[in-house]
Amino acid sequence: MPPKRNEKYKLPIPFPEGKVLDDMEGNQWVLGKKIGSGGFGLIYLAFPTNKPEKDARHVVKVEYQENGPLFSELKFYQRVAKKDCIKKWIERKQLDYLGIPLFYGSGLTEFKGRSYRFMVMERLGIDLQKISGQNGTFKKSTVLQLGIRMLDVLEYIHENEYVHGDIKAANLLLGYKNPDQVYLADYGLSYRYCPNGNHKQYQENPRKGHNGTIEFTSLDAHKGVALSRRSDVEILGYCMLRWLCGKLPWEQNLKDPVAVQTAKTNLLDELPQSVLKWAPSGSSCCEIAQFLVCAHSLAYDEKPNYQALKKILNPHGIPLGPLDFSTKGQSINVHTPNSQKVDSQKAATKQVNKAHNRLIEKKVHSERSAESCATWKVQKEEKLIGLMNNEAAQESTRRRQKYQESQEPLNEVNSFPQKISYTQFPNSFYEPHQDFTSPDIFKKSRSPSWYKYTSTVSTGITDLESSTGLWPTISQFTLSEETNADVYYYRIIIPVLLMLVFLALFFL
């Protein structure tokens, strides 16, 4: 794993303004003034000598050559952040932009008898930590949009075999040329989780535990496990909860990593209520609770369903626009009646609980328990009979779901007499707000975001509004109808299973 954040690296001696650096491609860069420092290095404005600029559009990050973080970050940029690669991805995914800083070059230089490593990157603007509220919060619409933008970035870097490992507001920067855009920077803790297509194996190492920013780092990192894609998704979930609520359950114990790990474990084990109760006045954490349910259900080497996660944060697919703190963004304060907040939280708890229970029934959770899906399959191959029975059970579940979906949905609106209106952010999100009027509006509108749940087992979106449980109730699915369906199904499947059992015994 890459070096820990708490390892002590000395900052380099400041370079004089005007010093010329030669990168490995033969390009020359003139240093401007120092504009900041990271955890391990200094950052300068930079100007290419072949194209004079009045306003610097590049920066140079400088560290001692022996420092590990810049080396890790440099390898990431060399493999992942080339301009042509990002451009092709944007076209392929039909994005307006991708929030990864562009990489322009790197090299080594000498100064006062010491060797330094430097990297030239795109210049970015201010970080979100500096522009958040006094308690570090953002509007809910902004939080959800930031989550979607970060999922775009994570999907790209995960596809290129890397994880970030240190998502937080201080590492999210606005664009310099276009402050409507947000970028994920600082890849000093980036990790190649799947070199050459071979995913790292799950292995706990307490000596490497609690790596990253303790407030947001994942449970795997607490255990000393090499980071994987689920770590980034989990970290993003904690960040969104912090940005919306202004606090996290373990903030008073940040000096005790073990206590933080325990608090995170409790939060994930007690979803969704553990997240919903942190909702600020006049808002809710339904989307974030559902997001963390999905993150917690991922196996160690499982690929997240990025589109489904985006659907959780933006269920109506409304086009993204400027962030509300950018030059064009505007916002309107939303007031939600106290009674509505109570009803919404009860409904959200009910629906997310159903979704969570369904995940538990469909997936073996013995790992978070210690093994990835791939390792488990290799170490414990199922016998033929058990495999067939498992497939039959899954098919039966799918059949029951299809049958249930064909029934007319129950009208749950009687207990929630309301309609959905929206507070509009120009070219941005519409944030749901309940008005308590006619229930008829639900016949024309789509379901609120907290009625949607995405299973990581399948790529579809299940509408939980049309169901009062994971299985049909007596009013939806009578005993005779179920029996008839089962008889027809098992008349076919039982002979097939018996034949497979016979063949298996014959050849053993």
From Swiss-Prot:
Its EC number(s): 2.7.11.1
Catalytic activity: L-seryl-[protein] + ATP = O-phospho-L-seryl-[protein] + ADP + H(+); L-threonyl-[protein] + ATP = O-phospho-L-threonyl-[protein] + ADP + H(+)
Molecular-function annotations in GO: ATP binding; protein domain specific binding; protein kinase binding; protein serine kinase activity; protein serine/threonine kinase activity
Active site: residue positions: 166 (proton acceptor)
Modified-residue entries (Phosphothreonine), positions: 336
Keyword Lipoprotein: no
Superkingdom of this protein's organism: Eukaryota
Subunit structure: Isoform 1 interacts with MAP3K7, MAP2K7, MAP2K1 and KSR1. Isoform 1 and isoform 2 interact with RAN and MAPK8IP1.
Similarity-based family: Belongs to the protein kinase superfamily. CK1 Ser/Thr protein kinase family. VRK subfamily.
Annotated protein name in UniProt: Serine/threonine-protein kinase VRK2
Species whose genome carries this gene: Homo sapiens
Recorded name of the encoding gene: VRK2
